[in-house]
Amino acid sequence: MTQVPNRETPRGIAILARFLASESAGGIVLMVAALAALIVANSPLSAGYFSILHSVWLGLSVELWINDGLMAIFFLMVGLEIKREVLAGGLASWGQRALPGFAAAGGMLVPALIYIAINWGNPQTLSGWAIPAATDIAFALGVLSLLGNRVPTSLKVFLAALAILDDLGAVTIIAFFYSAGLNLPMLAAAFVTLAVLIVMNRLNVRRLLPYLLLGALLWFFVLQSGVHATLAGVALALCIPMGKPEEEARSPLLFLEEKMHYWVAFAVVPIFGFANAGVSLAGITLGNLVDPVPLGVALGLFVGKQIGVFLAAVLAIRAGLAVLPEGSNWVQLYGVAMLCGIGFTMSLFIGNLAFPGSQHLIDEVKVGVLIGSGLAAIAGIVLLRSRFSRP
């Protein structure tokens, strides 16, 4: 008797492959990881969850390995994307950078001002001013992709470019405002390592292994120097050779970016989300939600982002410095500005840097980020699905 082949497994694999290849997959997986963290942190499993995060391995807690180690890989990916877009992508010319550049600047300035206004007079909480200034590129693009062809491709490109420039701004903020207690010998060692990487780039060394080995050494020196270790990822990315457009098939940067994409989207970022979104809601009242930190973060993300991004974009377009994305209208642009308030990954990350050693304030940041990002996602989807956003 001939055995009938089992077609279910290949079909299931095909469905999984299509999901992983979709634009929304990374955002959905991150959303699930964050929701799982919230559930676990408010269940009988919470003691084990927090115990694992605070357990020490090789001198660092698991939480620090995730935030300083795994996130360096995330920032390496961010750096690769920034370099690619600036050299040969959607940010290759000043004209292409204009609208997302102005919008990103407005989208960082206004949320920070709102947070500062709410926390004025409290030096301890004022240090969190940069928390609502960030946009989560995976989350925002994931939500936008759920809308399908309701949103023109030009707006998706605009949001991606804006988020990349936003990430560049966040990296700059971390470098200048959240690095303290410098260890000069280690910092010097980091600069020497970086200099070697730059020389390798100038000599057109195209093998990735030497870059990655020196990158790991650079990460160690930066970690010990007092500068935040994740910046080593960005520095390494900028040293990876891009090559000429006609050499795209042999580009070390494009090869590494392609190989890292799934690991970052479906492992690094979800692990970070699971480790950092868990906050116990026990004892939290409505009164706690209007404390300066969660209120400043939530309003900065939900209100500040949409106002800052949209207002800066309108001023740039009216001044003739930029043009409205092709095939889009003002309502659609405003809907995308709302989605920029999804600040999950980078906002939580900066929150950990702003309030080291204060679990209470970090928990307040988590609450503010979850509320602000959630409201921004819901409002953006509702507006972009409404009849007002149709061309």
Swiss-Prot record:
Molecular function as annotated in GO: sodium:proton antiporter activity
GO cellular component: plasma membrane
Listed GO biological process terms: regulation of pH
Residue ranges of the TM segments: 25-45, 56-76, 98-118, 128-148, 157-177, 180-200, 208-228, 264-284, 297-317, 335-355, 364-384
Family per similarity comment: Belongs to the NhaA Na(+)/H(+) (TC 2.A.33) antiporter family.
Topology class, membrane: Multi-pass membrane protein
Record key words, sorted: Antiport, Cell inner membrane, Cell membrane, Ion transport, Membrane, Sodium, Sodium transport, Transmembrane, Transmembrane helix, Transport
InterPro entries referenced in this protein's UniProt entry, alphabetically: Na/H_antiporter_dom_sf (IPR023171), NhaA (IPR004670)
Protein purpose: Na(+)/H(+) antiporter that extrudes sodium in exchange for external protons.
Protein name: Na(+)/H(+) antiporter NhaA 1
Species, as recorded: Pseudomonas syringae pv. syringae (strain B728a)
Compartments (UniProt record): Cell inner membrane
UniProt-listed Pfam families: Na_H_antiport_1
Gene encoding the protein: nhaA1
